[in-house]
Each structure stands twice: as structure tokens, then as C-alpha cells.
Regions:
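A short, charged helix-loop
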Residues: 208-236
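Flexible, small-/acidic-enriched active-site or ligand-binding loops
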Residues: 132, 136-138, 187-219
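A short core secondary-structure module
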Residues: 151-195
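A short, Trp-centered hydrophobic/proline-enriched beta-strand micro-motif
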Residues: 117-126
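Short Ser/Thr-interspersed hydrophobic loop/turn segments at strand-loop and sheet-helix junctions
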Residues: 51, 75-79, 170, 187-191, ...
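Alpha-helical interface subdomain recognition
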Residues: 1-85, 101-106, 113, 117-118, ...
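Short Gly/Pro-enriched turn/cap motifs at secondary-structure boundaries
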Residues: 87, 129-132, 156-159, 175-176, ...
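Helix-loop "lid/cap" segments that line or gate small-molecule binding pockets
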Residues: 93-102
């Protein structure tokens, strides 16, 4: 398998890297995390003008016909500067579902403005009792004339505090954990009966708590077929997990770079602590884990576009496990090698540490993905 980037991909990576270095270094993230939205519409528009929002969408949907590897390359660079714009929420999750299931009218109204950087989107799927089980949904959508009435609550909605519209998971039939009966609806942020509350996160990003109290949606706001959304939800969350691995890769690499630089500068007993062999071994092990995460991230990005559900699920679950296990080794050792200053807000190490920790838990933690991986067909035979 050829992992070499095309010339177009190399140019794109260089452009995103220059953008992060010049226009969105970590100092900008420090400023943005104290604002109401946590990101800037003008920067979102710049990203759209550069083609980074539309790169992986089909040309007939307003995109450039790229693939998920292109998306991952962008996210890896954005992770270096902790760029706060809602790329995963808008582009990967909600945008991906619209591209997969949307009618021409829905694409024109919701996807096109987002790809142009004029709006942002969010995917509201998680509920308090759900953990990581995608079929666990108590939000109900009942028939109301030619449309539907939505009632329920959604938690941890990425970009939910700032989005212009939502893709909402609601149950149109069945019990709360049935695999069938789940549907997707397009809901405007200003819809009567919809209340959203901003919830600050430990990583400096905010999410939204959505309360739907009799939200009326027209029949043309149903995204895809009624009662058959589970496969698309799983597909979207898998791509979200692959995207989390890609963003975290940029952050892990930066964490390693910061740590190695500190080992060269910090002196003890009259010499740089990086000259001590024991710490060199520790840094070497950190490098190995970062590279393992990168290899698994690349495979997950490739398989995110696979039509084979087994290949997609196995590659992405494996990458997510490596991110949590190998990534944690990098995180804890960066803190230990820096010492107490690493956990202060003034030190960038702590900001990367917290963001990676959030990404490790998004879309399934290591325990959940290990469980899914071991349950996939062929696992027992492969182990034997």
C-alpha cells in the first residue's frame, strides 16, 4: 500500500500548516476559549474560502471530490494549534450525514451554506443514559399532521451552543434501545420549543445541551428514510472517531516536540536533563507511541471511506484504542518530564493534554472500542 501523499495533498498540508502558524497559533485558542462561541465566523469563512470545508465532499454536492484522508490531513494540522473552529462537528458529522442522505433541496438549504463558511452545523445524538450505545434514544418524534413533533434532550452536542442548524436523532417507533425506529431530522437553531445551553468543557471547548419541548418540523425535514437511521448514525460516529484520531495526532506530535525541546533546555546538575540516558529512553518510547498512533490513524482514515462495514469498524476501533493507550503514555510522560509546571494553565502542555483526553473519550473510549473489536466477525478465528 502506498502511503505517499499526492502533490495536491502536500500543497494542502503546507497551506494549512502556514495558516495555523500565522493565523491560528495556540495563543489564539487561549483568547477564543473565553468567548461565548469559542471560535470566529471570519476564520471559519477563511477556511471555507481555502476549500478545506468542501475538500472531501462530492463535486455534485459542492465539494472537490476528495476523500477522508484529505480530511484527516487537515485535522492533523489544525490539531497542532488547537484550532477551535467546529470542523469535526460541522464537516465530518452533520455535513457527512447531509451528503450521505440529503435530498437536493436539503443539500441546497443546509449543506451548501456550511461549505461556503456562512453557517455551521451540529449533530445531536447523545443522551444522558446512552453512554456510547448508538441505538439508545429516548427523544421521541411523533407524527403531527404532515410533519413531526420532537420531544427530548440531547447532551454533549459538539458546536451545539453555536450551530445554525442541527441533525437530531429521534425515535419514531420502538422501545428506547431498539435498533430500528431511529430517524434523523433537520432542525433550525431558532425553532420554537428548542432551548440550548452552553456547557464549557475541560479542554476549553464548549458543547451544547439541547432541550426539545414540542419542536415542530415539516415532513421535508426528515433526513433519509423514517426509522432506518441506525446504520448512518454508526457510519457518522465512526468517521467522527477517525477524525478525533487525526486531530489528536497533531496534538500528540506537538506534545512530543514540546517535551523534547524542554529536555534540551532544562538543566540539572550543570547539564541538560535530556543528556540523561533514562530520560532519552523515555522520550524514545514516546516517539514510538506517537508513530504507532499515526500508523493506526492513517489506516482508520483510509477505511473510513470503505463500503465494507467490517473493515471500517475494525480499523477505526483499533485506532481509537491505540490513541487512548499509546496517547496516554505520551501525555503522562510529558507531564512527568516537565514537572509541576505542566499542569499550570500558563504552560501549553496542559492545554494539549486536556484536548487529547477529551478526544480519547469522544465517539467511544478504549473499553468500548475493544469490546466492539472483539465482537466483530472473524475475531476469534484470527486470535486462534
Amino acid at each position: 500500500m502506498n502511503f505517499e501523499l499526492t502533490e495536491e495533498q502536500k500543497m494542502m498540508v503546507d497551506a494549512v500548516k502556514r495558516f495555523v502558524d500565522k493565523d491560528s497559533p495556540i495563543t489564539r485558542f487561549r483568547q477564543m476559549r473565553t468567548t461565548e462561541t469559542g471560535w470566529e465566523p471570519k476564520v471559519w469563512k477563511t477556511m471555507a474560502d481555502n476549500g478545506w470545508l468542501a475538500v472531501s465532499f462530492p463535486e455534485d454536492h459542492g465539494g472537490y471530490g476528495g476523500n477522508f484522508v484529505d480530511t484527516s490531513l487537515i485535522l492533523e494540522q489544525l490539531g497542532r494549534g488547537l484550532v477551535p473552529e467546529p470542523y469535526i462537528a460541522s464537516v465530518v458529522l452533520a455535513g457527512g450525514l447531509l451528503s450521505r442522505l440529503g435530498t437536493p433541496a436539503q443539500l441546497e438549504k443546509f449543506l451548501a451554506p456550511m461549505l461556503e463558511g456562512r453557517t455551521s452545523l451540529a449533530f445531536a445524538y447523545a443522551e444522558r443514559q446512552g453512554r456510547y450505545e448508538t441505538s439508545d434514544c429516548e427523544t421521541a418524534a411523533t407524527k403531527s399532521g404532515a410533519g413531526y413533533t420532537l420531544r427530548g434532550e440531547k447532551v454533549w452536542v459538539l458546536n451545539g451552543h453555536a450551530a445554525d442548524a442541527f441533525v437530531v436523532v429521534a425515535r419514531t417507533s420502538g422501545a428506547s434501545r431498539d435498533a430500528s425506529g431511529l430517524s434523523l431530522f433537520l432542525v433550525d437553531a431558532d425553532a420554537p420549543g428548542l432551548k440550548r445551553i452552553r456547557v464549557p468543557g475541560m479542554d476549553g471547548h464548549s458543547t451544547g445541551l439541547l432541550k426539545l419541548d414540542g419542536v415542530e418540523v415539516a415532513g421535508d425535514r426528515l433526513l433519509g428514510e423514517e426509522g432506518s437511521a441506525l446504520a448512518s448514525i454508526e457510519w457518522a460516529l465512526d468517521r467522527g472517531a477517525a477524525a478525533a484520531c487525526a486531530e489528536a495526532q497533531g496534538e500528540l506530535q506537538t506534545l512530543l516536540t514540546l517535551t523534547v525541546e524542554y529536555l534540551k533546555q532544562r538543566k540539572q546538575f550543570g547539564k541538560a536533563i535530556g543528556s540523561f540516558q533514562a530520560l532519552q529512553h523515555r522520550a524514545s518510547d514516546m516517539f514510538a507511541e506517537v508513530e504507532l498512533c499515526k500508523g493506526m490513524m492513517i489506516l482508520a482514515a483510509i477505511q473510513a471511506d470503505s463500503a465494507n462495514d467490517l473493515e471500517r469498524k475494525s480499523a477505526i476501533s483499533a485506532a481509537k484504542v491505540q490513541l487512548q493507550q499509546g496517547g496516554w503514555y505520551v501525555q503522562e510522560n510529558s507531564v512527568q518530564l516537565f514537572g509541576g509546571i505542566a499542569i499550570t494553565d500558563e504552560q501549553d502542555v496542559g492545554l494539549y493534554f486536556k484536548r487529547i483526553r477529551v478526544l480519547q473519550g469522544l465517539f467511544g473510549d478504549a473499553d468500548w472500542h475493544l469490546g466492539r473489536y472483539s465482537s466483530l466477525p472473524g475475531f476469534e478465528g484470527a486470535a486462534a
